[in-house]
Amino acid sequence: MRPRPCSILSLDVGRRRIGLAGCDALGISVTPLAALRRGRFDADLVVLQAHCCERSVQGLVVGLPLDAAGQPTAQAEHCQRYGLRLAAALDLPLAWVNEHSSTWAAGEQFGLKGDRSGRLDSAAAALLLEQWLAEGPELKPAQQTASRSGAGAGDGGS
């Protein structure tokens, strides 16, 4: 089911960088943004708050790297913790999207294989956002998604 369009910040959370992408309030155009080099959470939060204010963000889409069987990986658990903490700090609802193979797909689609500048991470975040706009799930408050690891992220994958 397609979610209600709104201004979204999509995150492809990695250990070194966070790929970022946003969409307009109507969900028509998806734009990769400059990737964020990971630092302390408080420093990341300042940058992400600025993006949210500048873009009037109403929700977050966070990629969960599930395995081929749709099960959470160790990195998925890290992404979920980060996404929940960020959503709570920003007081924004969020949705999870299965990001299985999204980086590979972004590398193929945009000719960015092997990129280490962050462009590949943000291209993957853009694919996650396009997937969310097409398939959902609806955004939910962080506390409603906390107990359901991978909820809504098992379908599809990019």
Curated annotation (Swiss-Prot):
Biological processes annotated in GO: rRNA 5'-end processing
A Pfam family per the record: RuvX
Primary role: Could be a nuclease involved in processing of the 5'-end of pre-16S rRNA.
Keywords: Cytoplasm, Hydrolase, Nuclease, Ribosome biogenesis
Family: Belongs to the YqgF nuclease family.
Name under which the protein is recorded: Putative pre-16S rRNA nuclease
GO MF, any single term: nuclease activity
SMART domains: YqgFc (SM00732)
Cellular-component GO terms for this entry: cytosol
Principal location class: cytoplasm
InterPro entries according to UniProt: RNaseH-like_sf, YqgF, YqgF/RNaseH-like_dom, YqgF/RNaseH-like_dom_sf
Domain of life of the native organism: Bacteria
